[in-house]
Regions:
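N-terminal targeting/export leaders
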Residues: 2-9, 22-152
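Hydrophobic alpha-helical membrane-insertion segments, chiefly the h-region
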Residues: 13-23
Length: 152
């Protein structure tokens, strides 16, 4: 009796693992089948200087961001890119996409509940090894505004 209960438990656990894996794959495929809407924007720095370019694509849930720049941060600093939820009317929430690599590029891909809530991409110059999860707004170096479907 005890052995049959253990066997039933093991088989049920294995079935659940297989089913959850299949469901995750099906969800990922359904998200990829939605059409992507893409835009390219200039990252505008002080005085209207073009700091770099941001390519952004979304289908509402998946977001894919590619950033390029020719600028190099000051010694001991790094450039960090942020997706921001409307600096004036939204929550002001900033999601770090990570630091710009030495090659001057950044690639960010994420599946989100609502990727279109974001309205801006902001670049800041942060201390290397900075432990703060918050952006240093006083050290913002460039920004681009996202067009619809973003900001919804």
């Amino acid at each position: 009796m005890r052995l049959s209960v253990i066997a039933a438990f093991v088989l049920t656990t294995l079935a659940l693992l297989v089913m959850s894996s299949l469901l995750v794959k099906a969800y990922a495929q359904s998200e990829q089948s939605k059409p992507l809407k893409c835009q390219t924007g200039a990252l505008i720095g002080y005085g209207g200087t073009i700091f770099g370019l941001a390519d952004v694509c979304t289908n509402g849930n998946l977001i894919d961001v590619g950033i390029t720049t020719n600028y190099i941060p000051q010694p001991g600093k790094v450039f960090e890119a942020w997706l921001v939820d409307d600096l004036s009317k939204g929550s002001d929430y900033a999601l770090s996409m990570g630091k710009i690599l030495n090659s001057g590029t950044l690639r960010f891909q994420e599946v989100m509940n609502n990727a279109t809530t974001y309205t801006d991409i902001v670049m800041t110059q942060e201390p290397a090894g900075d432990l703060s999860p918050l952006p240093s707004w006083s050290n913002a170096v460039a920004q681009t505004w996202l067009l619809p479907p973003f900001g919804q």
